[in-house]
Swiss-Prot record:
Pathway: Cofactor biosynthesis; 7,8-dihydroneopterin triphosphate biosynthesis; 7,8-dihydroneopterin triphosphate from GTP: step 1/1. Transmembrane segments: none annotated. This is GTP cyclohydrolase 1. GO terms for molecular function: GTP binding; GTP cyclohydrolase I activity; zinc ion binding. The lineage of its organism: Archaea, Thermoproteota, Thermoprotei, Thermoproteales, Thermoproteaceae. NCBIfam families: PRK09347.1-3. Zn(2+) binds at C81, H84, C152. SUPFAM superfamilies: Tetrahydrobiopterin biosynthesis enzymes-like (SSF55620). Its EC number is 3.5.4.16. Keywords: GTP-binding, Hydrolase, Metal-binding, Nucleotide-binding, One-carbon metabolism, Zinc. Belongs to the GTP cyclohydrolase I family. It comes from Pyrobaculum aerophilum (strain ATCC 51768 / DSM 7523 / JCM 9630 / CIP 104966 / NBRC 100827 / IM2). The keyword Cytoplasm does not apply. It is an enzyme of class 3 (hydrolase). Gene3D superfamilies: 1.10.286.10, 3.30.1130.10.
Amino acid sequence: MITDRKAKAKPERGVEELLEYLGEDLTKPGVLNTPKRFVKAMEELTRGLREPPPEVVFFPLEYDVELGPVVIENIGAVSLCEHHLLPILLRISVAYVPGDGVPGLSKVIRLVKWAAARPIMQERFTEWLADLLMEKLRAKGVQVKVCGVHMCSFIRGVKDEHHNMITEARRGEIDVKLSCKRPLGCR
């Protein structure tokens, strides 16, 4: 989080101006601190823009064996649509073939959540995430499947609460059937 009070004043004023433009009464008790809360929420949802990626810890292979794919399904994450700054609820499944060492499970999940914490276009994000995982996991192969429910088409525009968008990317030699549950329940 950004802790400089002076730095936060400008975006908070911007939120106040937006609320006034929309016709909101800024003196209502429930709205008094909304600009501060909104800025704090945006900081949290975009922390991947400011924080360094989490360090990945590797465990050595204790015997000489060729490992098959490791699959982690349905990692929950939240991004923002870069066009509307509305949330995208994500379920991300990844598979990787370890290279020189096995990355810790929690570190892989943290890396995926960090990567998602920014404004994205899902198609481009999926490709970038595959490249990031290939590099950070020192993998021989990576496969990524991203299932997203975009609030920009869920609550506005076409207002379709039943859709989800699925994107996939593959790097190296890997072919796994990945699944991911719809972030707002299964159909």
